[in-house]
Structures are given as structure tokens and as C-alpha cells.
Amino acid sequence: MTTMNATAYHPNDGGGDGITATGTKAGYGTVAVDPNVIPLGSKLYIPQYGEAIAADTGGAIVGHKIDLCMESYEECYQFGRRDVQVFINY
């Protein structure tokens, strides 16, 4: 288990096409990570979010930061920024 600073994103942020760094479609359960901290493809469990797959990256996602994909912009705003526990390959 590790503690990470989490933010939330929507698949269409920045005019993106919703395709992750690993080529999958982004959706709830997809998270962006720094692959130097959490390898892409890792199965994760985040108590405030649920089960997830590390399938994406992001320019601001460096070190112990994680970005959780949400289904709506409202969910992103409600989530905000917070520290979360991340269980890797649980």
C-alpha cells in the first residue's frame, strides 16, 4: 500500500479522444500513473474509488500522483484533490 495525491479527470479532457497511453478506451476504473512508480497494467484498489487498472499517463502525473478517470465532469469537480491509499496488484 502507498499513499498518493489523487485528482480526477474525464476521458474528453483537453479535447482528447478518450484513448489511454496503453491504447485502451478511458472510463471509470482507468487511472493515470507515473510508470516509474506504478507499472502500466497494474491492478489497483483505491478505497474511495474501487478497482482500477493503471492504463494511462499524464504530463502532470509525476511521482506519487494518480489521476482517476470519472464518468462525468461533475464527479471530477466533487472529487477534487485528496490523498488516497493505493493497493497495488492486490
Residue positions per predicted region:
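Solvent-exposed, well-ordered loop and adjacent helix/strand elements within mature globular domains
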Residues: 1-90
